[in-house]
């Protein structure tokens, strides 16, 4: 595929270029990605199906069987491996490097993201615990403590969003540019992304709106089936007999698998948007460096 990456574009230009790249090469993209998406989607669908169908996973007073825990853990590892393969395959389409090189970078990226997610979760949990314990020791009402804790959590979430948004540039650069290093994700490339925070935000905002509109339509059948399953579980908790047919879970699994499979291509399109955003920012930064050294 011929791709003109390093060119100054507006956010609308990035979205348009991503759509053109995706639509004109859909057959090639499908041939190169379908297997990795299937490998990722199968365990994901099993986990969702199991989490919705197992009473042990939905009732706090029921012990979770060891076999269920082992199966869920195995599916999680399988899905994570499929996700890494999927990222590597998509990046190989864009950077034409070997699959091995892209697998290494995708694995490193996933490990970094897991650590960042864990760090953010720990910080939020610590702050929430500190706020609640402080208010309880001050004999403030539980309602006021909950409200304050919620407000602080929203503020912290917003702060993390602001701080991590430039990573949408530095991560793409790490995956695409063979000269980029791991340290650049929160180093030089991160600083470049920070200088273009507004551009990244508006690109993310508009892309997110389009993404959510399409995803809403895509997930409608899945949502209807899940709602039926949840209603049945609630009825069973109240002592009512199950009212779903015997083949319901086959339908649930098939719908989940198909939805997650198609959803992956929506993710590919959105990644193309930030691929072009990366190219635009990189072009601007190169021109900036030339003007400073001239």
Language model feature labels by segment:
Residues 1-56, 156-235:
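Nonpolar helix-loop interface/hinge motif
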Residues 12, 79-89:
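Central hydrophobic cores of alpha-helical transmembrane segments in multi-pass inner-membrane proteins
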Residues 15, 30-31, 73, 107-111, ...:
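Hydrophobic alpha-helical transmembrane segments
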Residues 41-79, 121-160, 215-264:
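Membrane-helix interface segments in multi-pass membrane proteins
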